[in-house]
Curated annotation (Swiss-Prot):
Molecular function in Gene Ontology: RNA binding; rRNA (cytosine) methyltransferase activity
Cited InterPro entries: PUA (IPR002478), PUA-like_sf (IPR015947), PUA_sf (IPR036974), RLMI (IPR023542), RlmI-like_PUA (IPR041532), SAM-dep_methyl-trfase (IPR019614), SAM-dependent_MTases_sf (IPR029063)
Name of the coding gene: rlmI
CDD domains: AdoMet_MTases, PUA_RlmI, RlmI_M_like
EC numbers, comma separated: 2.1.1.191
Keywords, in A-Z order: Cytoplasm, Methyltransferase, RNA-binding, rRNA processing, S-adenosyl-L-methionine, Transferase
Pfam families attached to this UniProt entry: Methyltrans_SAM, PUA_3
Organism: Vibrio parahaemolyticus serotype O3:K6 (strain RIMD 2210633)
Major location (coarse): cytoplasm
Protein family according to the UniProt entry: Belongs to the methyltransferase superfamily. RlmI family.
Function (record text): Specifically methylates the cytosine at position 1962 (m5C1962) of 23S rRNA.
PROSITE patterns: PUA (PS50890)
Catalytic activity reported: cytidine(1962) in 23S rRNA + S-adenosyl-L-methionine = 5-methylcytidine(1962) in 23S rRNA + S-adenosyl-L-homocysteine + H(+)
Protein name: Ribosomal RNA large subunit methyltransferase I
Disulfide bonds: none
Length: 397
């Protein structure tokens, strides 16, 4: 018999609106002894069936909903989800010429805690919830059925798994170990991805649209690409005709890959048209400001500053300081392209932070364009938390 949870009276409202999370305070009774990640039936306080969910006894999000239908959570279930997700993305895959894209965006694709990125024929999984871990083999088997020649690699080396009572883990789940370099293509740009050792699942696929949109601001411009990682924005800047691009990052291996990517695309990087600078971005910006060095375009795509609500105030200060410094080194008429991937910081708050940075920088700034995550990272209407990446193009007078 399937274990069950009964909600506190009134707590069923969000479930009826199809939100996939049930918090611990919303559960009135647990029937049976569900194991970590096991599928349970969800009922109202008076016994009306609502959903199928994965139970996680150690997490504040006590249950994550798999389905609002009375169906088994098995290989066939995941096959259907993968087929729907692939179909949803077919247009953008063809439009942008993608050989690397997000196949599954967790809750937004109806699979809580499951993220799957595709790089050529390597499918990289992050399984961040107890339910995802419990159903790992079914997920792998479903991928193999949908994509028979696939290789499946796990990159569940993410600290959030501890909140679910899980250990961090990586490794081959099916097929071959990824090589050091898997080359993908997007919008005609070739990018080398290190699946095993790179950030996230290997690359920041969510910024693809922003990289493309950045091209219209860079022709014949001096560009500073901050937190450049393996050079994504810098590659598009070179493609867009930038006069010079400085890629700044604290990781020398990432910069080495950025240079390799520029060579892979046969961009002209002679005469210092492209520079790969190993530097702490905060210190570098202060040095440029103090030296009076200025740029036409500054691209600011920092790592996530806030992992929890407790870190949000500190993150706000960090975002304000770094954007203030960026504004101070822009030429009159210059452009700041700035982004935040912190889900806890919404677009309104981020816009206020940029406005505060403009005041502190003593610069007059206009918002001229807004950005969000790429089209293969959809946001379900019932799950606004799926909208996490936001950005602005700002003109400095």
């Amino acid at each position: 018999m399937t274990a069950a949870i009964y909600l506190v009276k009134g707590r069923e409202k969000s479930v009826k609106r199809k939100h996939p999370w049930i918090f611990s305070r919303g559960i009135g009774k647990v029937e049976g002894e569900p194991a970590l990640g096991e599928t349970v039936d969800v009922f109202t306080h008076d016994g009306k069936w609502l959903a199928k969910a994965a139970y996680s006894p150690e997490s504040q999000i006590r249950a994550r909903i798999w389905s609002f239908e009375k169906e088994e959570i098995n290989k066939a279930f995941f096959v259907k989800r993968f087929q729907n997700a692939q179909l949803l993305r077919e247009d953008v895959i063809e439009r942008d010429g993608l050989t690397g894209y997000r196949l599954i965006a967790a809750e937004s694709d109806g699979l809580p805690g499951v993220t799957i990125d595709r790089y050529q024929n390597f499918f990289v999984c992050q399984l961040l919830s107890a339910g995802a871990e419990y159903n790992k083999q079914a997920i792998v088997d479903a991928l193999v059925e949908c994509f028979p020649d696939c290789n499946v690699y796990e990159r569940s080396d993410v600290a959030v798994r501890k909140k679910e009572g899980l250990k961090e883990t990586t490794g081959v789940l099916h097929g071959e170990e990824p090589p050091k370099s898997v080359v993908i293509e997007e919008n005609g740009v070739k990018i080398s991805v290190d699946i095993v050792g790179g950030h996230k699942t290997g690359f920041y696929l969510d910024q693809r649209d922003s990289r493309q949109q950045a091209m219209k601001y860079v022709k014949d411009k001096e560009v500073l690409n901050c937190f450049s990682y393996t050079g994504g924005f810098g590659l598009y800047a070179l493609k867009g005709g930038a006069k010079r691009v400085i890629n700044a990052d604290v990781s020398q291996p990432a910069l080495d890959t950025a240079k390799y990517n520029a060579e892979l695309n046969e961009f002209d990087i002679s005469k210092k048209r492209a520079v790969f600078l190993n530097a702490d971005v905060f210190k570098l910006l202060r040095e440029y400001r103090d030296q009076g060095t200025q740029f036409d375009v500054v691209i600011m795509d920092p790592p996530k500053f806030a992992e929890s609500k407790a870190q949000l105030n500190g993150a706000c200060r960090g975002y304000k300081d770094i954007n203030m410094l960026a504004l101070q080194i822009l030429k009159p008429g210059g452009t700041l392209l700035t982004y935040s991937c912190s889900g806890l910081m919404d677009q309104v708050l981020f816009q206020k932070i940029i406005a505060d940075a403009a005041v502190d920088a003593n610069r007059q700034v206009k918002f001229v364009e807004r950005f969000e995550q790429a089209a293969d990272h959809p946001t379900d209407t019932a799950y606004p938390e799926g909208f996490y990446l936001k950005g602005f193009a700002c003109k400095v007078l």
